[in-house]
């Protein structure tokens, strides 16, 4: 029997995990100088990716190689809906969205303040998106973020506000998945919302938090999976090893990533949507 060590910090693992750990013949984990003696299959993480999957996923797949071998050659992932879900969401869109244009999903808020692009900047990007596509917009956010969303909407022009489809705001993870299946793209804060869209084969444009190393989480494919990070414009001020310093300066760093820096890339992506 084999056991794969979770890709988390050791301190977070309960003592019951370690008691069970001893009974496994094959123990697989990432190679570290202080844990190599525990595993009989130590995995050295690759540093560069020549595939379209980002490093964060490839590192986890590496843990399965001793068990599955070359069965991992196909690393694409897909999210599927039931026929009933497809029918229900299609009917909901027909009743809610005017015209025949598919909406654009906006990942309006990150999981926390450290992963949320300043809303005054996001408002500018939403305006650009509407001016470029004239498409309906859906805002994705958690209920606790409603006040910030209200602030965001107040910053928008009347025509853009009207394009916001409040009746289609997702109210659960599964609801988000089925809603995105009917959208033409997902744009905004990098995170789970963007990654789910990739699993549905939707074009995405992600704005990374300055504290996240994009190389581990993103693979650029023009007009398909695109992203921006402060390091693209100010590499001299970004040190991914000094995360504590970046967290302390998160607001200042975010404000440096002005929409004008990537306006051309943003609009170019939107113009290619179908």
Identify the meaning behind each predicted range:
Residues 1-274:
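Catalytic machinery of carbohydrate-active enzymes
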């Amino acid at each position: 029997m084999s056991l794969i060590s979770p890709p988390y910090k050791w301190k977070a693992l309960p003592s019951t995990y370690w008691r069970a750990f001893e009974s496994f013949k094959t123990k697989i984990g990432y190679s570290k100088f202080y844990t190599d003696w525990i595993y009989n299959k130590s995995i050295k993480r690759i540093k560069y990716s020549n595939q379209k999957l980002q490093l964060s996923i490839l590192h986890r797949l590496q843990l399965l190689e001793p068990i599955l071998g070359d069965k991992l050659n196909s690393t694409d992932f897909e999210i599927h809906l039931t026929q009933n879900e497809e029918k229900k969401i299609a009917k909901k869109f027909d009743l809610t969205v005017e015209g025949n244009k598919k909406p654009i999903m906006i990942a309006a808020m990150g999981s926390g303040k450290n992963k949320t692009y300043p809303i005054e900047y996001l408002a500018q990007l939403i305006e650009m998106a509407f001016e470029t596509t004239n498409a309906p917009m859906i805002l994705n956010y958690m209920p606790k973020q409603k006040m910030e969303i209200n602030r965001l909407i107040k910053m928008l022009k009347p025509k853009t506000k009207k394009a916001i489809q409040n009746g289609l705001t997702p109210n659960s993870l599964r609801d988000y998945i089925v809603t995105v299946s009917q959208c033409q793209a997902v744009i905004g804060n990098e995170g789970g919302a963007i990654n789910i869209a990739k699993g549905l084969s939707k074009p995405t444009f992600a704005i990374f938090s300055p504290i996240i190393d994009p190389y581990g989480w993103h693979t650029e494919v023009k007009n398909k999976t695109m992203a921006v990070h402060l390091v693209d414009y100010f590499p001299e001020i970004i040190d991914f090893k000094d995360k504590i310093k970046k967290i302390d300066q998160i607001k200042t760093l975010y404000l440096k990533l002005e929409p004008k820096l990537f306006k051309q890339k943003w609009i170019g992506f939107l113009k290619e949507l179908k």
